[in-house]
Amino acid sequence: MSRVLVLAGGSPHAHDFAASGDALATLAYSQGHEAARAVHPDDAASALDGGSFDALVVAGLWWRMHGAAYDAWRADWAYDTPAAIRAVIASFVRSGGGLVALHTAPICFDDWPEWHDVVGGAWRWGTSSHPPYGTVTAAIVAPEHPVMAGVREHIELRDEVYGGLDVRVDVHVLATARRTPDDADQPVVWAHTFGTGRVVYDCFGHDSASIAHPHNAAIIANALAWVTERA
């Protein structure tokens, strides 16, 4: 049985991360994993430093909250990533721990450039964007990959498409979607390795309904299985 740590929390201005964390822990448990919860990176780093987890799932938003749009939230929720937290998380994945990063992960830890190497991509203010929450259709472009085993050719759910991300050239894109009908295809699910750790990023997972949706739940379940097999 693999042990999975679900880190879900951070700024609640647009997401119910507590509900998302519950949904992810429930999904992990349903797939035969032992799941534990953390709501803050400090707690996650302490747990990971103990050496008993096989994978980390990140569904949260810890960032510096630059910009006037976040003035009301910044005092309570702005986050600078301590060096000790960076070292533990990077070492965990680099040395073979798995990572499943959802939705807002490319925005997280925006003061820590290496995090975006770990995830495989980054949100770039002024370039990246997403349309309003709504119905999304994604195309599976790498059906042969274990993360897409048993997933239908096109999936549909209610979520957001993040586009214009700064994506590493060495990731294996598994699914694409468009923000608008005339948009270019945007990578929305990818896999890669960081050190000896396996990583999957899933753009979807805005809320617990998206996580529990059969199409997305299948991807997350497969991702957990893949990242907990040592590369």
Protein language model annotation of sequence segments:
Residues 1-53:
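Aromatic-Pro/Gly-enriched surface loop or interdomain linker
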Residues 9, 60-61:
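Cell-envelope and extracellular/periplasmic
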Residues 28-29, 117-195:
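Catalytic beta-strand/loop cores that center a nucleophilic Ser/Cys/Thr
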Residues 55-59, 201:
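Structural motif
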Residues 63-149:
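A glycine-rich, often tryptophan-bearing local segment used as a flexible ligand/cofactor-contacting loop or short
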